[in-house]
């Protein structure tokens, strides 16, 4: 099982949906698709070029969160492979889309979908072209009790090599066509609990990008050598990292 594309879903609590969508439209520079779903609960953030990979959902209840969509050729085959690797199926909605809702061994929600996508968008320019930035990583925040199991699981269901960079972080080595990297972070605490996630941005000017997000209403929560943690006006916290955007393989855009 190897997904050909990965999308991140920003799932907002009902009272945070409008403000959350506005913040991420401004933060990414992306447009917004028409809404879809029975109550208009779904939409996609549309980059200036390439295929979309960030989507939004208004939840029926509960707190805001992130979940992943893994795009696969055959949902039934992918479900079988994911379950064999330790996933639990939590829903198989009726309808033409034929998607499946699952949870990882540590309880992180994800979906298997068949929507086609192939072209990774270029980073967005800011400050008159002085710097660029992009949302290019989902970091899974993993309690120690399930860390090793989650690393093995996500490497298996993506087919991406797990490459530890420290006791705290493990990178999954993405193919050049993927718009999102996956980073697995071992939390210090709590010892147990469900796996959660947050978005990470890369930029050619971390300080300027941080200031831009603060001007959009985000609040700086903490600064570290490799990243800055921000709390948006609505939704989950996210990070602006010290990484610069990875180059895009021209052949992957042909």
Which residues does each PLM region occupy?
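Generic beta-strand structural signal
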Residues: 66, 98-100, 108, 136, ...
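Core segments of cupin and vicinal oxygen chelate
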Residues: 1-52, 77-78, 84, 90-100, ...
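C-terminal functional regions that serve as terminal interaction/effector modules
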Residues: 198-206, 212, 219-223, 229-248
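Short proline/glycine-enriched turn/loop motifs at strand-loop junctions of beta-rich domains
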Residues: 72-75, 203-207
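Hydrophobic, ordered structural segments
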Residues: 71-76, 84-118
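Conserved short beta-strand elements that form part of the metal-binding/catalytic scaffold
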Residues: 28-64, 108-116, 160-195, 231-247
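N-terminal beta-strand motif that seeds the catalytic metal site of vicinal oxygen chelate
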Residues: 1-21, 66, 113-152, 157, ...
């Amino acid at each position: 099982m190897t997904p050909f594309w990965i999308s991140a879903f920003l799932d907002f609590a009902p009272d945070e949906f409008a403000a959350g969508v506005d913040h991420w439209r401004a933060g990414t520079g992306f447009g917004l698709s028409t809404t879809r779903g029975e109550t208009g609960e779904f939409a996609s953030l549309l980059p200036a070029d390439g295929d979309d990979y960030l989507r939004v959902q208004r939840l029926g209840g509960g707190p805001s969160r992130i979940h992943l969509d893994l795009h696969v050729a055959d949902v039934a085959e992918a479900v079988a492979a994911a379950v064999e690797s330790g996933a639990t199926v939590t829903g198989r909605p009726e309808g033409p889309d034929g998607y499946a809702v699952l949870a990882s061994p540590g309880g992180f929600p994800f979906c298997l979908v068949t929507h086609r996508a192939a072209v990774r968008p270029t980073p967005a320019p800011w400050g008159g072209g002085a710097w660029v930035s992009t949302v290019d990583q989902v970091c899974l925040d993993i309690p120690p009790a399930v860390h090793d199991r989650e690393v093995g699981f996500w490497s298996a269901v993506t087919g991406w090599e797990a490459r530890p960079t420290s006791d705290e972080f493990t990178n999954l080595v993405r193919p050049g066509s993927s718009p999102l990297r996956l980073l697995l972070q071992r939390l210090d605490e709590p010892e147990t609990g469900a796996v959660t996630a947050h978005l990470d941005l890369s930029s050619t000017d971390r300080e300027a990008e941080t200031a831009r997000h603060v001007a959009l209403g985000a609040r700086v929560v903490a600064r570290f050598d490799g990243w800055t943690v921000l709390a948006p006006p609505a939704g989950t916290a996210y990070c602006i990292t010290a990484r610069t955007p990875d180059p895009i393989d021209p052949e992957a855009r042909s």
